[in-house]
Amino acid sequence: MTTNIHDQRILILDFGSQYTQLVARRIREIGVYCELWSWDVEESDIRDFNPDGIILSGGPESVTEENSPRAPQYVFDSGVPVFGVCYGMQTMAEQLGGKVATSTEREFGYAAVQVTGESALFKDLEATQDVWMSHGDKVVEIPSDFVKIAETETCPYAAMANEEKKYYGVQFHPEVTHTKNGMKMLENFVLNVCGCEGLWTSASIIEDAVARIKEQVGDDEVILGLSGGVDSSVVAMLAHRAIGDKLTCVFVDNGLLRLNEADQVMEMFGNKFGLNIVHVNAEQRFLDALEGESDPETKRKIIGHVFVDIFDEESKKLKNAKWLAQGTIYPDVIESAASKTGKAHVIKSHHNVGGLPDDMEMGLVEPLRELFKDEVRKIGLELGLPYNMLYRHPFPGPGLGVRVLGEIKKEYCDLLRRADAIFIEELHNADLYNKVSQAFTVFLPVRSVGVMGDGRKYDWVVSLRAVETIDFMTAHWAHLPYDFLGKVSNRIINEVNGISRVVYDISGKPPATIEWE
């Protein structure tokens, strides 16, 4: 019998913290299903969701300001355990009779917290804990039925608890890795206080997804746009496991892929895994549509429109295809809901976030829409996809279309593909590939004088780009060894006829973006 992986669940109310999705990912890592909703959710929605516990996230607002966000009163009337983090602790204190004040000393960074009392939250943890603080306000008076369970030198109430009602608040962020035992605190809350078990595993997620796809589509056929990226690849494997040859994958080679990528996709999914794939070689069609266009945003739109047109044409050839499978993941759903309503809300509503035509008369199959990217990768491994494919660096949707600056020509793409392949190969050879978050090569539409043998040449310039980042919102340029960069440069100039100069991009984000276009 299939495990009901949604049987136990945690609700996270989002007050706007940059770390809120990280809280959700941590709960999933513990093995428990959770959803992320906006703080101003309706009481009826919480009641219908029936959570085993509620977490109130951090946020940028001040509890002391008029009209700042508050948790719905039902959170405290529902009888379920509640865990307030940073702003979540402050609003809990304020709403239950305590006091919050703006602090003269803003605490940001590492802090040593002294545990001052026994609590289920700090079970099996030592008296001093290294934590990550990020707050201006602080609780100066806790509600009368709470006790202090931790403090710092500058924060008298670093944590508070009402053990009887199972309410807990911490002024720090247990979800970030900087809080050394933060994961243990979250485990104590989710597993011990809320009584959840670890039902949410890669194997059980796959089992659930396969059963749902079978139930949803019955004997109908399904079509999927397979790009070779992580999300569509995992959807392909799940759907194939569920319905076999009733799945048709459409792989569009737009001429903007990495070196040999089209062959690799066909070899892996067609030959190795035996999926039914329609391979559309549309390089010339994309190049014709892009001819003369140099504006980055317009290039993106053209690439998107041509892909949609081709996919539409191919889907019409499959008369029995009633369903469209998409690689929508949970952050897409949250972002899509937030952009439409101003708030992240329930996962069940269907947003077509893939940009495919609205007049496509097909049902949507989205087996990943509850999953974060790290979860998608883990189930990909479980399904037999290679590690190197699942954990390779991000590649933009428009591909080389935004890595060839200015107008796109086949000559430029071919040169860039070969130069980029050398850079990536050398990163692997030097054991540096997994030490940077993203690395790639950019083609610059400018010529530079070079010397080859006794002759001069006047050829193109490429830039190498490598960054280190945690969340891709900000990034540092990677300080790769000079000897390594020299080796890559020499190989590119000697092996790629048409490139005379290699430069290295040392811009951080901000002010620069990671991609050049």
Swiss-Prot record:
A single Gene Ontology MF term assigned here is: ATP binding
Catalyzed reaction equations: XMP + L-glutamine + ATP + H2O = GMP + L-glutamate + AMP + diphosphate + 2 H(+)
Amino acids binding ATP: S227, G228, G229, V230, D231, S232, S233
The chain positions of domain GMPS ATP-PPase read 200-392
Domain Glutamine amidotransferase type-1, chain residue ranges per copy: 9-199
State which Enzyme Commission number(s) the record gives. Answer: 6.3.5.2
A Pfam family assignment: GATase
**GO cellular component term, pick one:** cytosol
Name the PROSITE patterns for this protein: GATASE_TYPE_1, GMPS_ATP_PPASE
Q: In which pathway does it act?
A: Purine metabolism; GMP biosynthesis; GMP from XMP (L-Gln route): step 1/1
Catalytic residues as annotated in Swiss-Prot or TrEMBL: C86 (nucleophile), H173, E175
Please provide the record's keywords in A-Z order.
ATP-binding, Glutamine amidotransferase, GMP biosynthesis, Ligase, Nucleotide-binding, Purine biosynthesis
Q: Main role? A: Catalyzes the synthesis of GMP from XMP.
Output the NCBIfam families linked to this UniProt entry. Answer: guaA_Cterm, guaA_Nterm, PRK00074.1
- Subunit: Homodimer.
The protein's name in its UniProt record: GMP synthase [glutamine-hydrolyzing]
Species of origin reads: Aliivibrio fischeri (strain ATCC 700601 / ES114)
- Per the record, the gene is guaA
